């Protein structure tokens, strides 16, 4: 029996147990709303008729997260026992229609990079490019606006991290699911933990601790505050960092990094190697889809112009709904960083693009063979690497 099936959440049980429901939201007194994988936003026929019943339910729900909710601490961000993420706002003093909450359900099998390709969030070549970059220790921010699928895409990329690596994940609420055996999962502890004053453990604290744990990669659920300075310090000392970030473009990302409350010195920003911009976009049919709008390499900071240089590697064309490798032949990371790390001679550095093509072909073959499950894909990619398929001729794949 799965953990999810052992959790009794009363009126919410049918929604929790339905694998096609992604989100559950209650805006106050009234019906429960859901986000369905097929039918999208729907209003249910059940809910609450008065604030007292709703408040009592919310109190019990918060108790299941071990973060009790009170008038003094009326907002809780936490995780249910099955791993689902929940946000609760308590009482009519703050939420005028009555207590409200939103549950983002945890998935038993996270979405794999091949599933993202099926959804047309990205394509094989983009995935192959990210694979070679992440495998070779590049730092990356998955950036976009709310509900753009940043965490889902970042999690899918963890299959590109070498299987022998030690990974530390740091989050406010645990969402990332890493397939590696050597994985240290850490979660911050703030107000509402029920342990009294002085018991807080922040993202900043966890990041500082992570640097002493000798990780090969550090994954941060989201960088939004002073922990950003520690993350960039980690990058500067050779610890690759992968994280999500709220910004709709590279320019806005840099503005946020250099402004309050993160305050990264401009000369530090290029320690970040890659910025992937992802968004939820509306197609002509009216369907909302998620697309990686661009993948960008941060090249450097020019002190004379006070500007940043970045090169767009991939670009999404909204007219054709396809992706273009705009940076082919001009990648700073591939030619000047990764090719050197792989021991490719100067006069043969153009061959690094052949390596990207080879990996794209491997992903396509794995897709056709049916390895779309997150964990199945990870184990198969581990097997591929152990058998040396990355070094053989592409025609033999």
Predicted regions mapped to residue ranges:
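Phosphate-interacting basic helix/loop segments used at nucleotide- and nucleic-acid interfaces
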Residues: 1-21, 72
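Switch/coupling sub-region of P-loop NTPases
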Residues: 129, 134-143, 156-282
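Walker A (P-loop) phosphate-binding loop of P-loop NTPases
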Residues: 147
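Conserved lysine of the Walker
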Residues: 150
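Terminal-proximal interaction/regulatory segments of ATP-powered molecular machines
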Residues: 354-397
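P-loop NTP-binding catalytic core
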Residues: 26-27, 31-139
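Conserved P-loop NTPase
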Residues: 274-364
């Amino acid at each position: 029996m799965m953990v999810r099936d052992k959790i009794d959440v009363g009126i919410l049980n049918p929604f929790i147990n339905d694998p096609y429901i992604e989100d559950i939201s209650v805006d106050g007194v009234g019906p429960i709303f859901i986000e369905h994988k097929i039918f999208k936003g729907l209003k249910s026929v059940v809910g609450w008729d008065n604030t007292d019943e709703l408040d009592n339910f919310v109190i019990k729900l918060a108790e299941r997260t071990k973060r009790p909710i009170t008038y003094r601490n009326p907002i809780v961000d936490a995780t249910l026992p099955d791993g689902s993420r929940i946000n609760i706002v308590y009482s009519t003093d703050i939420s005028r229609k009555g207590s409200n909450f939103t549950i983002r359900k945890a998935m038993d099998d996270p979405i794999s990079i091949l599933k993202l390709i099926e959804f047309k969030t990205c394509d094989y070549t983009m995935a192959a490019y990210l694979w070679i970059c992440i495998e070779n220790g590049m730092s990356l921010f998955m950036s976009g606006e709310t509900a753009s699928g940043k965490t889902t895409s970042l999690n899918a990329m963890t299959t590109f991290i070498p299987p022998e690596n030690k990974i530390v994940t740091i989050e406010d609420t645990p969402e990332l699911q890493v397939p590696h055996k050597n994985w240290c999962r850490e979660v911050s502890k703030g107000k509402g933990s029920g342990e009294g004053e002085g018991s807080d453990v922040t993202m900043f604290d966890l990041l500082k601790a992570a640097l002493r744990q000798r990780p090969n990669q550090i994954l941060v659920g989201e960088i939004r505050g002073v922990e950003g300075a520690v993350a960039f310090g980690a990058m500067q000392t050779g610890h690759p960092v992968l994280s999500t970030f709220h910004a709709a473009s590279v320019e806005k990302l840099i503005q946020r990094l250099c402004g309050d409350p993160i305050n990264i010195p401009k000369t530090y920003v290029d320690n970040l190697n890659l910025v992937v911009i992802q968004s939820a976009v509306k197609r002509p049919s009216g369907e909302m889809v998620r697309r990686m709008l661009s993948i960008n390499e941060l090249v450097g900071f020019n002190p004379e112009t006070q500007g940043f240089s970045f090169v767009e590697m991939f670009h999404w064309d909204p007219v054709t709904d396809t992706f273009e490798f705009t940076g082919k032949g001009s990648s700073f990371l591939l030619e000047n960083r990764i090719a050197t790390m792989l021991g490719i001679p100067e006069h043969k550095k153009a061959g690094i693009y052949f390596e990207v093509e080879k990996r794209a072909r491997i992903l396509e073959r794995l897709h056709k063979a049916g390895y779309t499950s997150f964990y199945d894909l990870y184990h198969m990619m581990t097997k591929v690497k152990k058998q040396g398929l990355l070094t053989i001729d592409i025609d033999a794949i």
